[in-house]
Swiss-Prot record:
UniProtKB keywords: Actin-binding, Cytoplasm, Cytoskeleton
Subunit (UniProt): Occurs in many kinds of cells as a complex with monomeric actin in a 1:1 ratio.
Name of the protein: Profilin-2
A GO molecular-function annotation: actin monomer binding
Location within or outside the cell: Cytoplasm, Cytoskeleton
PANTHER family: PROFILIN, PROFILIN LP04
Keyword Repressor belongs to the record: no
Main location per the UniProt record: cytoplasm
Sequence similarity: Belongs to the profilin family.
Described purpose of this protein according to its UniProt entry: Binds to actin and affects the structure of the cytoskeleton. At high concentrations, profilin prevents the polymerization of actin, whereas it enhances it at low concentrations. By binding to PIP2, it inhibits the formation of IP3 and DG.
C-alpha cells in the first residue's frame, strides 16, 4: 500500500459522517511521505518544534504549536507519543511513530475525539508494522 493510500483511505476516511479537514504523513525530518491536497504548507522550523516537543514534552506549551502559520494551543496529549492542539472550533492531533509523524487537522462538526481516533489508530498500526 502506498503512503498516499494511507492518507486517502485511513486518515481522510469517513467517521460518523465526518472527515478530517486535512491530513499528512511526514518523516521526522519534515519530508512529506503523503498528504491530502489541502494540507497546509508548513515551514521546516514548525516541524522541528513539533519533533522537539516529542523529545522534550512541554516545549510547545508556552508558545503554542504552529503549522502552516496557524497557531494551536497545546492541550493534554500523551508525552512523547501524541500532541494535541486546539484552535477555535477545530484542532490538530499528531501521533509519533518510530519513523513518521501522523497529522490530522479537523474542524466542527468533527470532534476532537474522532480526530484522535483516526490519527492514533493509524499511528498504532504503523508502529506495529515497524514504522
Amino acid at each position: 500500500m502506498s503512503w498516499q493510500a494511507y492518507v486517502d483511505d485511513h486518515l481522510c476516511c469517513e467517521i460518523d459522517g465526518q472527515h478530517l479537514t486535512s491530513a499528512a504523513i511526514l518523516g521526522h525530518d519534515g519530508s512529506v511521505w503523503a498528504e491530502s491536497p489541502n494540507f497546509p504548507k508548513f515551514k521546516p522550523e514548525e516541524i522541528a518544534g513539533i519533533v522537539k516537543d516529542f523529545e522534550e514534552p512541554g516545549h510547545l506549551a508556552p508558545t503554542g504549536l504552529f503549522l502552516g502559520g496557524t497557531k494551536y494551543m497545546v492541550i493534554q496529549g500523551e508525552p512523547g507519543v501524541v500532541i494535541r492542539g486546539k484552535k477555535g472550533t477545530g484542532g490538530i492531533t499528531i501521533k509519533k511513530t518510530g519513523m513518521a509523524l501522523i497529522l490530522g487537522i479537523y474542524d466542527e462538526p468533527m470532534t476532537p475525539g474522532q480526530c484522535n481516533l483516526v490519527v492514533e489508530r493509524l499511528g498504532d498500526y504503523l508502529i506495529d508494522q515497524g514504522y
